[in-house]
Swiss-Prot record:
SMART domains: CBS. GO terms for molecular function: DNA binding. Residues 10-67, 70-124 form the CBS domain. Exhibits a pH-dependent oligomerization state: at pH 7, the dominant species is a dimer, where each monomer is a two-CBS domain protein, and at pH 4.5-4.8, the dominant species is a tetramer, with an oblong shape. At pH 2.5, there is formation of intermolecular hydrogen bonds, suggesting the presence of high-molecular weight species. The physiological dimeric species is thermal and chemically very stable. Gene3D superfamilies: CBS-domain (3.10.580.10). Keywords: CBS domain, DNA-binding, Repeat. This is CBS domain-containing protein MJ0729. It comes from Methanocaldococcus jannaschii (strain ATCC 43067 / DSM 2661 / JAL-1 / JCM 10045 / NBRC 100440) (Methanococcus jannaschii). The CBS domains bind adenosine derivatives (AMP, ATP, NADP and SAM). The CBS domains can also bind calf-thymus DNA and E-boxes recognized by transcription factors. Binding of the nucleotides induces protein conformational changes.
Amino acid sequence: MMIMKVKEVMNKDFIKISPNDIGGEVVQTLYKEKKNYAPVIEDGKLVGWITALDLLIGCKHSKIEDLMLLIDEIKILKENDEVTDELIDEIIKNEDIAYPVINDRDEVVGTLSVFDLLKYYKNR
């Protein structure tokens, strides 16, 4: 497997959700953008992660902060991490769709999804 950095594969054009956003509005945004996930960001920093499944079981009137996964409940990638066989195996084992990607200042700079990896490998 060719070693590459997360930042070479990640999606830099991602949806940014606030903890104060309302579930129903986020559902519409995700649907419109054809996404199943989004980082929850406050002051440029990752504070959580929301998925379509979280929204499905939550209330459309709830704030995202009440529905999101907290940062200690998710895997966070750094943009200079390497995409290794171990990472790929972890994605497969956990059936994860995507991860948030941060830089050295803990600012969200992108997301890495299974689809980003597939596109990268297809276009090599």
